Amino acid sequence: AGELAVADTGAANDIYDKMIAQKANFPEGLKWTNDNYYGWKGGIYSGGFGCAAFAFAVSDAASGDARATIHHDYNNIRVGDILRVENDTHSVIVLEVKQDSVIVAEGNYNSSIHWGRELQKADLADNGSYIMTRY
């Protein structure tokens, strides 16, 4: 089991590095609204606008054309996962997983790109929320 954990950590670090590299394309404060569209390679949706467009673009940069799956296990959130939150109204992508919270990047947050907001895990799960993972 130890080898799997090490391999998983390596994959998470690689995904993190690829996501952070996207700051060059999507700098903090860049205007980003529902006018922005991105076609996604993850397979669940063909693409999205606004917050989903940003999450999908960063996800593709990190995971290529790996297929995504949906789950609702909030104890199994991983770096690079896309969280659909706030009763299915906002998408964020996970940069870091802590014991009780996650650090995310997001588009269309106050009409712009934002890196580094902390969300409490206890606030993530609601009736409309889910997790898209590409692991």
Regions found by a protein language model. Give the residues of each.
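Compositionally biased amphipathic helical and low-complexity segments enriched in hydrophobic
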Residues: 5, 31, 94-96, 120, ...
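Active-site signature of cysteine proteases
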Residues: 99-135
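...with weaker cross-activation on analogous glycine-rich loops/strands in unrelated enzymes
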Residues: 56, 60-114
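Residues within well-formed alpha-helices
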Residues: 54, 91, 126-128
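N-terminal capping segments
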Residues: 1-60
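Alpha-helix initiation/capping motif
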Residues: 47-51, 73, 120-125
